[in-house]
Amino acid sequence: MAGDVEGFCSSIHDTSVSAGFRALYEEGLLLDVTLVIEDHQFQAHKALLATQSDYFRIMFTADMRERDQDKIHLKGLTATGFSHVLQFMYYGTIELSMNTVHEILQAAMYVQLIEVVKFCCSFLLAKICLENCAEIMRLLDDFGVNIEGVREKLDTFLLDNFVPLMSRPDFLSYLSFEKLMSYLDNDHLSRFPEIELYEAVQSWLRHDRRRWRHTDTIIQNIRFCLMTPTSVFEKVKTSEFYRYSRQLRYEVDQALNYFQNVHQQPLLDMKSSRIRSAKPQTTVFRGMIGHSMVNSKILLLKKPRVWWELEGPQVPLRPDCLAIVNNFVFLLGGEELGPDGEFHASSKVFRYDPRQNSWLQMADMSVPRSEFAVGVIGKFIYAVAGRTRDETFYSTERYDITNDKWEFVDPYPVNKYGHEGTVLNNKLFITGGITSSSTSKQVCVFDPSKEGTIEQRTRRTQVVTNCWENKSKMNYARCFHKMISYNGKLYVFGGVCVILRASFESQGCPSTEVYNPETDQWTILASMPIGRSGHGVTVLDKQIMVLGGLCYNGHYSDSILTFDPDENKWKEDEYPRMPCKLDGLQVCNLHFPDYVLDEVRRCN
């Protein structure tokens, strides 16, 4: 590869002027300057050099001693490099190879011929591979080149190939401590399991015994909580650096504590447990296809805007609610198939960990609930009201993540189901829903700072305390709608309005409303093009996405609508349709490590 030659041609070279100078040059006419480099002499035209190079223009037009000289000695570049640069100035073309690019880049930088510098950068980026990465890295460092983002592109290659590069002696020799630290701190390394990054660091340290003094500092950029317990025990604790580094022993102890306290992991938010991920993925936990329940398989909306299905464990639940705590997903309640083959309200709670693509069943809620609402405040997940087939609730309970237990708190003011809940400013807002009489416009907010005592909370029949407070009602009564907080406001989308409670006759409510907590006012916004209920909602790229659901024409949807809050406009077909028509889906944005996504890519 080193001998491969590639030609580059200038697109801005003035052909008419250059042709004239080229003819004079070839005939040896009117040459008025000789440039001496090493033991070689190059004759040229001052005027041509001045038009092509800022370096020569200043030399020949400013008050410099070389202006009137006919022989000029240039130092700091090679004759080989300058001969190619001089050819470019006359002919507008240049040939580059790995054997010559170093000297040509040196000469181009010297005489400030930026176009040739760009050609050299393009050539190097096209040629970069594992075998010559260290050489290219050294070359760019030698000349401090960063034209057209060449360093960023080189770093992208390095991050994408970090582990295999760290097995190469030439790369290990050249990679500095500072560069290694910057790479280990970069979330784009997520395509490699953390244990592989640790082994790569070991290779760098072993390459030169003098590097061991950096061990404690480097180790702090390895995220041991992302490893498996087996990897920590078998590959980290057995290494010579475990005995050498006090910081490594501390990090391992932290990781082992993290592994042991399974239920508390969402609250142990520290650098060593955070996924290396630059951008979250819109994630759909599948609910219903028509009237058939689907296990909670996972769909990912991935660029270039296609849907991937994430293979892995499934949970036998059609969840009604989703809660996110530090990139862990909790799916709560909803419906599950009973032994009689019928759907029943569920008390089950499952937690999904995208780090390992794994599920864990948590403590059940105190009572089965479907069509209820949840919200996360601090270390608690609140579950509000809801129903079973035979009973409607007003009870409210909360899940303590630290001890994997549920306890009752101050109940909602009335029995209700089909409502929606969202947390804003550390308060849980509940909107709409169905009461014993009709669909509701009610908005009620739960303030945990006003909760009663433990003794009060244990009495399920207690009277309502001042924990719940009514706010201004929505403009439209609705149930089975969706609500999301965005930029300090609450947005409500779709749903239905029950007209006759006895027959459950209903009509669609396609309207959109926004709530401003500072003024306690609701404002009507542009209605959805196609009203729906049972849909999912999330925010992506400053737009609110509405996915799937049951449309008012009676058909289940696989489409995605997007709402721009700034312009108050709806758009359709901005994103590809989901691979199936879904109702009751739960949607969120999750960070996944790239090694999980790579496996998804292979399966799709």
From Swiss-Prot:
GO cellular component: Cul3-RING ubiquitin ligase complex; nucleus
The Kelch repeat ranges on this chain: 328-379, 381-426, 428-473, 489-542, 544-590
Keyword Iron: no
Superkingdom field: Eukaryota
Major localization listed first in the record, in broad terms: nucleus
Reported effect, Y552A: Decreased interaction with RBBP8 and increased DNA-end resection and homologous recombination frequency following DNA double-strand breaks compared to the wild-type protein. No significant change in subcellular location
One MF annotation (Gene Ontology) recorded for this entry: ubiquitin-like ligase-substrate adaptor activity
Pfam families: BACK, BTB, Kelch_1, Kelch_6
Location of the protein in the cell: Nucleus
Keywords: Intellectual disability, Kelch repeat, Nucleus, Repeat, Ubl conjugation pathway
Residue span, BACK domain: 133-237
Pathway stated in the Swiss-Prot or TrEMBL entry: Protein modification; protein ubiquitination
Task performed by this protein: Substrate-specific adapter for CUL3 E3 ubiquitin-protein ligase complex. Acts as an adapter for CUL3 to target the serine/threonine-protein phosphatase 2A (PP2A) subunit PPP2R5B for ubiquitination and subsequent proteasomal degradation, thus promoting exchange with other regulatory subunits. Acts as an adapter for CUL3 to target the DNA-end resection factor RBBP8/CtIP for ubiquitination and subsequent proteasomal degradation.
Quaternary structure, from the entry: Homodimer. Dimerization does not affect PPP2R5B-binding, but is required for its proteasomal degradation. Interacts with CUL3. Directly interacts with PPP2R5B; this interaction leads to PPP2R5B proteasomal degradation. Interacts with RBBP8/CtIP; this interaction leads to RBBP8 proteasomal degradation. Interacts with PACMP micropeptide; interaction prevents ubiquitination and degradation of RBBP8/CtIP.
Name used for this protein in its record: Kelch-like protein 15
Primary gene name: KLHL15
